[in-house]
Curated annotation (Swiss-Prot):
Glycans are attached at residues 29, 237. This is Zinc transporter ZIP9-B. One of its GO terms (cellular component) is trans-Golgi network. It comes from Xenopus laevis. Its main location: Golgi.
C-alpha cells in the first residue's frame, strides 16, 4: 500500500471515529444531573488525555525520530571509519538531548500561549456586548471549540509529517495516539457544549468542524510537502513538535476553560463565594475516573 492510500484511509478512520464518539452524548437523553456528571467525566477525559497521552506521545515521537536519525548517521560513520574514540560521540549525544529538551518546553509553551492569545482576542471582542455574563459564556464555547480545532489541526500536521517519512510503524503509532485522545476529546467537547446550553444543531456543526480538522490538515500536509521539505522536517522532528504544540493548546482548553466551567467557577469574577459550590463527591469521582481512563488506555498501548 502506498503512502497516499494509507494516509487517506487513516484520515477517513479518524473522521468517522471522532464524529461517532462525539455523537454519543447527543444520542442519549440525559437528565440535568446526569448531564452534569457526563460533562465532568468529559472534562476529566480532556485533562487525563492531555497529560497521560499527548505529552508522552509527543516526547516519544521527538526522541524516536532523533534516535532513528542517530542510528542512520552512526551506520554511515561506521562504514567510513571503524575505529573512533567514543568521547566526541558522547558529547554530541548530550548536546542532541539538550536540544530535544528545549524543543519539548518551547513547543508546549507556544501551544499554551497561542491559545491564551486566541482566548484574549476572542473575549475582548465578546466583552463589548451589553450582557458581559452572556458574552463570557459565548466566548467560552467558541474558545473551547476553537482550541480543540487548533489542537486537531496540529495533530493532522503531525500525522501528515509522519506519513511523509514513509515509515508505516511511525504512521500507525501517531495514528493510534491521535485516536486515543480524539475520541475522548470529541466526547468531552460535546458534553461541555451541551452543559453550556448550545442547541443540538450548533453542537453537531462544532463537532463536524473538530472531526474534519485533523484529516484535512494531515492530507494537506502530506500533499504539500516536497521531497526537500520532508528531509528538512525530519531534521527538526516535525511530528514530535506538532504533537507537543497541540498538547499545549489542549492543556489550555482543558484546564483554563472546561475544568473551571464544570466546577461552577467559570471565568466569572463573582464575589459571591456561594455561587462557586464546587463538585459533589460523585462528580469528583467522575472527574478522577475521566482523568484515569486515558492513562489506562495509554498503558495498554505500549510501544
Amino acid at each position: 500500500m502506498d503512502d497516499f492510500t494509507s494516509i487517506s484511509l487513516l484520515s477517513l478512520a479518524m473522521l468517522v471515529g471522532c464524529y461517532v464518539s462525539g455523537i454519543i452524548p447527543l444520542a442519549v437523553n440525559f437528565s440535568e444531573e446526569k448531564l452534569k456528571l457526563v460533562t465532568v467525566l468529559g472534562a476529566g477525559l480532556l485533562c487525563g488525555t492531555a497529560l497521560a497521552v499527548i505529552v508522552p506521545e509527543g516526547v516519544h515521537a521527538l526522541y524516536e525520530e532523533a534516535l532513528e536519525a542517530k542510528h542512520h548517521e552512526m551506520g554511515e560513520i561506521h562504514k567510513v571509519k571503524d575505529a573512533e574514540t567514543g568521547a566526541e560521540a558522547s558529547v554530541a549525544h548530550e548536546h542532541d538531548h539538550s536540544n530535544l529538551h528545549a524543543y519539548i518546553g518551547v513547543s508546549l509553551v507556544l501551544g499554551f500561549v497561542f491559545m491564551l492569545l486566541v482566548d484574549q482576542i476572542g473575549s475582548s471582542h465578546m466583552h463589548s456586548a451589553d450582557d458581559p455574563e452572556a458574552a463570557r459564556a459565548a466566548s467560552s464555547k467558541i474558545t473551547t471549540t476553537l482550541g480543540l480545532v487548533v489542537h486537531a489541526a496540529a495533530d493532522g500536521v503531525a500525522l501528515g509529517a509522519a506519513a511523509s517519512t514513509s515509515q508505516t510503524s511511525v504512521q500507525l503509532i501517531v495514528f493510534v495516539a491521535i485516536m486515543l485522545h480524539k475520541a475522548p476529546a470529541a466526547f468531552g467537547l460535546v458534553s461541555f457544549l451541551m452543559h453550556a446550553g448550545l442547541e443540538r444543531n450548533r453542537i453537531r456543526k462544532h463537532l463536524l468542524v473538530f472531526a474534519l480538522a485533523a484529516p484535512l490538515l494531515s492530507m494537506l500536509t502530506y500533499l504539500g510537502l516536497s521531497k526537500s521539505s520532508k528531509e528538512a522536517l525530519s531534521e527538526v522532528n516535525a511530528t514530535g513538535v506538532a504533537m507537543l504544540f497541540s498538547a499545549g493548546t489542549f492543556l489550555y482548553v482543558a484546564t483554563v476553560h472546561v475544568l473551571p466551567e464544570v466546577g461552577g467557577m467559570g471565568h466569572s469574577h463573582k464575589q459571591d463565594l456561594g455561587a462557586a459550590k464546587g463538585l459533589s463527591r460523585l462528580e469528583v469521582c467522575a472527574l478522577v475516573l475521566g482523568c484515569l481512563i486515558p492513562l489506562v488506555l495509554s498503558i495498554g498501548h505500549q510501544h
